[in-house]
Amino acid sequence: MAAPSGGVNCEEFAEFQELLKVMRTIDDRIVHELNTTVPTASFAGKIDASQTCKQLYESLMEAHASRDRVIKNCIAQTSSVVKQLREEREKNLDDLTLLKQLRKEQTKLKWMQSELNVEEVVNDRSWKVFNERCRIHFKPPKNE
């Protein structure tokens, strides 16, 4: 699933996380998808497993790339805000509101960066399941 066309709201971490949750649906349902679309040996002749695996591969690649873009875009945006707040803070060391805002943005940035680790785990799990069921039906291109 691609990111919504209206853009991503990186300002609210809860909205950012909810978007990722929705975007991870394909990974959450991969076992069910494979069980219902890729035949076992006894039903091998009734469904084109290579085409099904190819389509699932392409969907996974698109979903993973899309989420990676969203996460990295939000990290870049939040990093920019943190940098700006740091510069303002250096000019006005007595402003406690500014300090509080800086800390809040730094925390949000750390959470967003941790989503990259979550993404790696989610992707690894999906590829493991995909390869277990599709390796005999479909060979992904070597360049990816």
Swiss-Prot record:
Coiled coil residues, start to end: 82-120
InterPro entries recorded: MIX23
Modified residues (N6-acetyllysine): K100
Pfam families membership: MIX23
The UniProt record lists the keyword Acetylation: yes
GO cellular component: mitochondrial intermembrane space; mitochondrion
Keyword Nucleotide-binding included in the entry's annotation: no
Residues with the N-acetylalanine modification: A2
Keyword terms, alphabetized: Acetylation, Coiled coil
Superkingdom: Eukaryota
Entry similarity comment: Belongs to the MIX23 family.
Name of the protein this chain belongs to: Protein MIX23
Source organism (scientific name): Bos taurus (Bovine)
Lineage: Eukaryota, Metazoa, Chordata, Craniata, Vertebrata
Gene behind this protein: MIX23
